[in-house]
UniProtKB/Swiss-Prot annotation:
A lipid is attached at residue 20 (S-diacylglycerol cysteine). InterPro entries: BamB (IPR017687), PQQ_b-propeller_rpt (IPR018391), PQQ_rpt_dom (IPR002372), Quinoprotein_ADH-like_sf (IPR011047), WD40/YVTN_repeat-like_dom_sf (IPR015943). A lipid is attached at residue 20 (N-palmitoyl cysteine). This is Outer membrane protein assembly factor BamB. Keywords: Cell outer membrane, Lipoprotein, Membrane, Palmitate, Signal. One of its GO terms (cellular component) is cell outer membrane. Belongs to the BamB family. The keyword Cytoplasm does not apply. It comes from the Bacteria. Transmembrane segments: none annotated. It is found in: Cell outer membrane. The keyword Kinase does not apply.
């Protein structure tokens, strides 16, 4: 078992564990796989790179760039937000959300969830339980709202609402126009959970979200009423680690089917209307996954990259040469699957057979959040804050 991020009451630790017990002095040591040797079939190149503040350091974060109307929006943990020209990376505007703390110092904003762009606004959440809406034109704050807890997942905008899943198990809907809280749903919290929350998926007027209690919930967005809940991960085992049941990945809804993935649980297909389980496969992960056509692509909790069928979750291929390299979530780009790792490499994988087709050293600080593919561009932000635009 591999554990990347752990939340204990009053204590945040970024850990890498193996074995069955959190407190076992004889636990096995997890070793990162050596960098695989790859004969590049093409040469990925960096079109441009731009520094955005000090990045996230060694803190858990869900900050990654967003692209809209040929503008890249990115942020760092301290509170710097920048808009960049997507063609050359040149700065259009920058603002700081850090608060003044005396004459010469500022209190960092601790941005953690985002970036999301929609309807002329840039949305970002913080560990200080603040959600910001910035105007895309100049970065000025359109509104700022205090929510129920740390906003660790990215804001999701749908049907005039901004949906926020907080670290204390609350799903909140804010008015897109002014940030007013319209409703709050309690998703329950166990005593111990992984640090990080599922961002909701939206479909047919419902918000579908994973919870730290091992359940997937569907909520009526208009009124905040619970439609159904379904457990996909059961808290079992003799240790606290074994009993972690978080569903921190974002569900994917396709043709009336909800696909959800738990950490110590299952990849599960659920009926959107009833929540009933259609099929399940024993797999675990904290990384978001992809449903494309008749395939599911994912990175499991041990950093195996896998392709499975959408009907039944049958394994099509598995790439096991990146074990314990702390991979990002995958992204599809130009017909290949791309993942980043903690040493700053991008790995390009053939979607048909799982073989490597290219490898690229990009950044020495490493990657934690997934690449973003949009409008023919591949963007990724390193832990030190540098944003890269990659082409092949």
């Amino acid at each position: 078992m591999q554990l990347r991020k752990l939340l204990l009451p009053g204590l945040l630790s970024v850990t890498l564990l193996s074995g069955c017990s959190l407190f076992n002095s004889e636990e096995d040591v997890v070793k990162m796989s050596p960098l695989p040797t790859v004969e590049n079939q093409f040469t990925p190149t960096t079109a441009w790179s731009t520094s955005v503040g000090s990045g996230i350091g060694n803190f858990y974060s869900n900050l990654h760039p967003a692209l809209a109307d040929n503008v890249v929006y990115a942020a760092d943990r301290a509170g710097l937000v920048k808009a960049l020209n997507a063609d050359d990376g040149k700065e259009i505007w920058s603002v700081s959300l850090a608060e003044k703390d005396g004459w010469f110092s500022k209190e960092p904003a601790l941005l953690s969830g985002g970036v999301t762009v929609s309807g002329g606004h840039v949305y970002i959440g913080s560990e200080k339980a603040q959600v910001y809406a910035l105007n895309t034109s100049d970065g000025t704050v359109a509104w700022q709202t205090k929510v129920a807890g740390e906003a660790l997942s990215r804001p999701v905008v749908s049907d005039g609402l901004v949906l926020i899943h907080t670290s204390n198990g609350q799903l909140q809907a804010l008015n897109e126009a002014d940030g007013a809280v319209k409703w709050t749903v309690n998703l329950d919290m166990p005593s111990l959970s992984l640090r990080g929350e599922s961002a909701p998926a939206t479909a047919f007027g419902a918000a579908v979200v994973g919870g730290d209690n091992g359940r997937v919930s569907a909520v009526l967005m208009e009124q905040g009423q619970m439609i159904w809940q379904q457990r996909i991960s059961q808290a079992t085992g003799s240790t606290e680690i074994d009993r972690l049941s978080d569903v921190d990945t974002t569900p994917v809804v396709v043709n009336g089917v909800v696909f959800a993935l738990a950490y110590n649980g299952n990849l599960t297909a659920l009926d959107l209307r009833s929540g009933q389980i259609m099929w399940k496969r024993e797999l675990g992960s904290v990384n978001d996954f992809i449903v494309d056509g008749n395939r599911i692509y994912l990175v499991d909790q041990n950093d195996r990259v896998m392709a499975l069928t959408i009907d039944g979750g049958v394994t099509l291929w598995t790439q096991s040469d990146l074990l314990h390299r702390l991979l990002t979530s995958p992204v599809l780009y130009n017909g290949n699957l791309v993942v980043g790792d903690s040493e700053g490499y991008l790995h390009w994988i053939n979607v048909e057979d799982g073989r490597f087709v290219a490898q690229q050293k990009v950044d020495s600080s490493g990657f934690q959040t997934e690449p973003v593919a949009a409008d023919g561009k591949l963007l990724i932000q390193a832990k030190d804050g540098t944003v890269y635009s990659i082409t092949r």
